[in-house]
A protein has these predicted regions:
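Active-site and adjacent substrate-binding regions of carbohydrate-active enzymes
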Residues: 1, 5-529
Length: 529
């Protein structure tokens, strides 16, 4: 239905705060007052008690961090929006009861974690971080080397132990009872470990996802599962399974490719990638995004951008105040893993260019493209607001990802959104306007037909058609800083129908004329205005 096309807002639980009010309650207030008729779902990043990584090192899965609010606040938000919660089930905190009991060799916790000393060959393990894979602990039953994919405070769970799986099932049941509708399986690709393998995307991991889907759909047949697998494109697509794994998969190649296209003024790689993407079958879809609480993943661009092009993008990000996080390869080398930068700040200058007047135009162009693509859009709250780099917070925390995790004081935010002299007001208004245009179009259903159109490499264009074939929509986007012209005859518009650009409202009456696109201008031309 139309609600499917509205998309998700991606938000940290503390990103809007007001003294004397729990952050989750203030978030609800902002969402209802500002986005009720624009966004249909909200992804609240981990809201449990945690020890590190901004929530992704969970101490207690069954509780809401009292500093943030309560389960009542989560339920209240769920009464207005579809709520997505993270299942951070690859690992949990060293401060959790489970891990403390593991060290004591008592239940619950005995056998819940992985002792790397029991694995003969770890030479092929794929790492998303540069930290050591194993961390030594002194437990009551001897010295162990616990497996830590993401860092020493985040200890991987042992799914060879069925008690671990039963714990996760109980947690899922509680979340469903509290009104959670979307389940994001965080870092799920690393779930199963096997000696002598990469320990990523293993067949056992896919079997566990199938099992979790059966459990979740048994509890709530309308629930939706999203897999978070920040990996090269082919591996990412495998998480659809045979209609028995994820309902939604993140389109991880989109952020680096779209950013490169906008900053280079050349979309040939974006077009090549899109023509290779199979359409998602009915009942499943791509989750399109270009910014999130994490950085912009660079691994999904491997094989799509050349090393020289990737180096150019990385240099541009650094010039715009961003950072590059590294991972360690099985050979021990450090290689770029993700770009840490606010998306608005990333649009500051073109590659090999200087700061210019097109920052907002580039930013809006990128989101206009994302909103038009096959799939469901997910928009990070700092993209809705046009938040810039939080370098002060990054330096204070010592974590690169903090650069894109700014915490707005509610009064400051509302003042910024009401100030004609600040870009936040214009960004927020235009983003909401584009989303509301999208909502009304049958051709933007997540599974509506999509075909790539081939004009110059400065124009990223595609055609969408509604499931009932009544609405045709041509989405054309100038990704360059130069004016572009396209003869209307190249679109093969049906002369007996009226064609209008939904974004500007301009009616195309002379089909022998031309479309003129100013720098970073976009048009959505349709026969159903």
């Amino acid at each position: 239905d139309k609600a499917e096309s509205r998309g998700l807002g991606d938000v940290y639980k503390r990103q809007i705060k007001k003294e004397g009010r729990p952050p989750l309650r203030e978030l609800n207030n902002f969402m209802v007052s500002q986005l009720k008729n624009t966004i249909s779902g909200v992804h609240i990043l981990p809201f449990n008690p945690y020890s590190s990584d901004d929530g992704f090192s969970v101490i207690d899965y069954t509780a809401v961090n009292p500093e943030l609010g309560s389960w009542d606040d989560i339920t209240a938000l769920g009464n207005e929006f579809s709520v997505m919660a993270d299942l951070v089930i690859n690992h949990c905190s060293r401060e959790s009861l489970w891990f403390k009991n593991y060290e004591k060799n008592k239940a619950p916790g005995r056998g819940y974690f992985i002792n790397g000393l029991e694995f003969e060959d770890l030479s092929q393990v794929v790492r998303p971080r540069s930290t050591p894979l194993l961390t030594e602990i002194h437990a009551v039953d001897g010295v162990k080397q616990v497996w830590c994919t993401f860092g020493e405070d985040q200890v991987d769970l042992n799914y060879r132990n069925p008690d671990v799986l039963l714990e996760i099932v109980r947690i899922i049941r509680q979340y469903v009872e509290q009104g959670i509708h979307f389940f994001r399986l965080d870092a799920i690709a690393f779930l199963w470990k096997e000696s002598g393998t990469s320990c990523v995307h293993l067949p056992q991991t896919h079997e566990l996802i199938k099992l979790l889907r059966l459990v979740i759909e048994n509890l709530d047949p309308s629930a939706v599962i999203i897999t978070e697998t920040n990996v090269p494109n082919r591996e990412n697509l495998s998480y659809f399974g045979n209609d028995n794994e994820a309902h939604l998969i993140y389109n991880f190649s989109l952020p680096p490719l779209l950013l490169y296209s906008i900053l280079s003024g050349d979309c040939k790689h974006l077009k090549t990638w899109m023509t290779s993407m199979p359409p998602a079958r009915s009942g499943r879809a791509y989750l399109n995004f270009i910014a999130s609480h994490d950085g912009i993943g660079l691994r999904p661009a491997e094989g799509l951008l050349s090393p020289r092009e990737l180096d150019g993008l990385i240099e541009n990000i650094r010039e715009s105040g961003g950072e590059i996080s590294m991972r360690r390869t099985p050979q021990g080398d450090l290689t770029p893993y993700e770009a840490n930068i606010s998306l608005y700040s990333a649009m500051e200058r073109p590659i090999d260019g200087e700061v210019d007047d097109f920052q907002m135009a580039r930013f809006i162009c990128a989101h206009t493209i994302m909103l038009a693509l096959e799939g469901l859009p997910a928009i990070y709250i700092h993209s809705l607001l046009g938040t810039e780099n939080n370098r002060e917070g990054m330096v204070h925390s010592g974590r690169a990802r903090t650069i894109n995790r700014y915490h707005w004081e509610a009064d400051d935010l509302y003042a910024a959104l009401d100030d004609d002299g600040r870009h936040h007001k214009a960004v927020f208004a235009e983003m909401k306007r584009l989303i509301q245009i999208r909502i009304a179009q049958d051709a933007f259903h997540p599974n509506a037909t999509q075909y790539t159109l081939h004009f110059s490499d400065q124009i990223f264009a595609f055609w969408r058609e509604s499931l009932d074939r009544k609405q045709s929509l041509f989405a054309l986007h100038n990704v360059s800083s130069e004016r572009q012209t396209i003869p209307l005859v190249e679109l093969n518009l049906i002369a007996t129908e009226a064609w209008v650009d939904l974004i500007s409202g301009f009616a195309y009456e002379d089909l022998a004329g031309q479309i003129v696109l100013e720098p970073y201008e976009c048009v959505w031309i349709t026969n159903k205005g």
